[in-house]
Amino acid sequence: MVDDSDLNIITALGKNPLGTVQEIARRTGMTSATISIRLKKLRQTGALFSVSAQLTYPVLGLEPVVTFIEAPFKSLSRLEALFDRHPYTRYRVRCVGYYNGLYGLFAVPERTLPILRDFLDELKGGIITDYRLDTPTNGWTYSEVDYNLYDMSKDQWSFDWATWEASLDVANIGVPLPKLPNSLLRRLDVKDLRILEQLTIDARRKGKQIAAEIGITPYHFTRRMQFLNENRVIDSYRVIVDKGVSRLVTTFMFLCHCDPDETKRFATAFTTLPFQSTVIPTHQGFFAQASIPPLDLPILGSILQQRCDKVECLWSDYRSSMRYYFWPGAYCDGSWNASREFMVNTVLGGAA
């Protein structure tokens, strides 16, 4: 069971995910000893899973693909097993709403989107009924949860949506969205990829601990981390907490069709939300995933509907979610395995 002090620590982590115990202590007004004890307890109880690196996939020679699968309920377990077997799955969760089935995020080698389509086409007529793919056009934006707006005694959130909506009108749309960076895969080696793997598992571990896990020196780890940071290989750090920390939060997904200026407005505005969210600009507009109080869904939905040509809404079953650590096993001799055999046949061949 968490208390207000625990929530204060989680909020501080969201603002400074890699902050030292001393930095978190200063931000929360607690002692370093108290922070250490409470962080340990949060991990032991499962309230705080980890702080995980969100990677900039294009830098790694990978193309992110937002995927929505229409599938009958009886097929979902088998479909999830196939997603688990696929070497380039990054995330999956069951969803209900505009699409009923599964939402998945893939990060496939550049120019292999047709092979991913082949994989999904093989499932049509049997496991799934249809699917939709979308690819990002620009860099992603994020927000982290701020429990300062959560009253634990009342189990109630307070957020001024009217002020947030007004911010859309004054957003600076003259500032372009971040461009998708070019690949730096040729400047990376398998040790770099193993560093990234460990950072997706838990980025708050000490550098010497991660270095020992990989089998490199702390100096090599520090030097390569400097390179990875300078080249934006790591896009963000997400604080992964148990959804039960606040019972009044549900993850909703919105596929919004709108013009580029509206995408800019919402991409900027979502970064100011006190809830964990991700916005991915797409060719049609943008895709947003946000964990918000269900009672606030009509408010956010109405704001989106007023400004977008079309809004497709879904909600997810967090109990079924699976987040995959970055896997260097598909990398060999300077490139990713991009064969149909590896991305389709092997996956389907081992299906139950």
Residue ranges and their predicted role:
Residues 1-352:
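A compositional/biophysical signature of low hydrophobicity enriched in polar/charged and small residues
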